[in-house]
Amino acid sequence: MKLNELMQAIPVFTGEASETIEISHIAQDSRKVKPGTLFICIDGELVDGHQFASRAVELGAVAIIAEKQLDVSIPVIYVRDSKRAMAMLADYFYGSPTQALKLVGITGTNGKTTVSHLVEQIVRENGEQTGLIGTMYRKIGDQILETKNTTPDSLTLQETFRDMLLSGVSTAVMEVSSHALVQGRVYGSDYDVAVFMNLSQDHLDYHHTMEEYANAKSLLFAQLGNSYHTSNPKIAVLNADDEESVRMQKATAAHVITFGIKQQADFKANNIRITSHGSTFDLRTPIGNFTLKIKMIGNFSVYNVLAAIATSFALHIPMEKAIKTVESIPGVKGRFELVHAGQEFPVIVDYAHTPDGLLNVLETIAEFAEKRVFVVVGCGGDRDKGKRPQMAKIAVDYATNPIFTSDNPRSENPRAIIEDMIQGVPYSDSYVVHENRRDAIRFAVNEAEAGDVILIAGKGHEDYQVIGDEVIDFDDRVEARIAIEKKLGLA
């Protein structure tokens, strides 16, 4: 593609977009530059891409997008916002793939991963080829690809959408993080349905205030645009029980569908019954009433199912198909996942890493726990420190046997993180501390008896632990199974 054609994606810029320069590749990482590359300088949180412009030229870049003045031997085009420009250029370069896809974006503090998997499976069961982008992986049809972020950078994102189209995908479902929205990674993506789950404290190390965090989430709904007079109107699916849904609704001109348990909603659950094996509830919808029996446990699971069914309705999938699918799904890896190895007590691994997420899971466990509740919990390093005492307080208030441990300490001292947690529970001596996460899991398993419940919280599906600059193999589910087998004399 000629540079002058590609630059049609950007309405205002400074510099000459030559009609003779051929662009075969776009990169923001100088290590990925090859002959024919348009190199985009991003001034990021850790690294300023402008510092690598000369290196990009050496590697074969033929033009550069920048915000700051550069002294290089190839054409430089200057823009106000390189991140936004990169997203728009990526969309244009890869043929605006989301205009040919049905695209669903799901945002919120908790529930994104589960809802995205539920919606993807519902659409797949309806006979469509699907794509999925989220915390655990990217999926194109049956192909699984690794992912580093919940929402990839805009270049990777648009390339993935292009690959989905080439593979016959018709509907893509993706998690949309607040970081991605603020950083402009999803600019240029044409969403058909946007879903808001909830908002509670998380990522304040980045957003600083809950107001900024909420505003970040609302960007997804502002991006839906105004489609009242089109044959395929955009739809916002909102949690009626979360007060921030008002903000999301104000941010969009799209149609709104609501779901909830407490407030009036288009998709409302009544008569919820929770057991250790699943949940049942009556569902009221715009097209009739239904009774559901799902294999997932807890009110938070009911919210996730409501969101998935409301989204399926927005995608014109038959209600019976959506209900049958969600009733057949046992859950998502690392989300209230049971570890069975012959023990007499349930061991649950869950990704709960926010105060609200931990509270939801512990409240659910309280519905069926017969005796003691053990919770193994830590907090991530180099992340929102404000939630550490809150996590500890919830663990102490809602579990009989809290065990404070390491999560992903990253560059911080694990003991210092635990000390931050303990600041939230000066009134309690019910907790114990095992800094080593493996030791904490083994302690819980060895102490537990029939009728008790163990929750291992915070890491869920993750199969690694980040300690300093080292990433080590570590999976809560594997560690729990090993501990159980040792206790039972099976290992």
Swiss-Prot record:
Residues where ATP binds: 108-114
Gene3D superfamilies: Mur ligase, C-terminal domain, Mur-like, catalytic domain, MurE/MurF, N-terminal domain
Pathway linked to the protein: Cell wall biogenesis; peptidoglycan biosynthesis
Motif (Meso-diaminopimelate recognition motif): 407-410
Localization per record: Cytoplasm
Catalytic activity entry: UDP-N-acetyl-alpha-D-muramoyl-L-alanyl-D-glutamate + meso-2,6-diaminopimelate + ATP = UDP-N-acetyl-alpha-D-muramoyl-L-alanyl-gamma-D-glutamyl-meso-2,6-diaminopimelate + ADP + phosphate + H(+)
HAMAP family membership: MurE
Protein name per Swiss-Prot or TrEMBL: UDP-N-acetylmuramoyl-L-alanyl-D-glutamate--2,6-diaminopimelate ligase
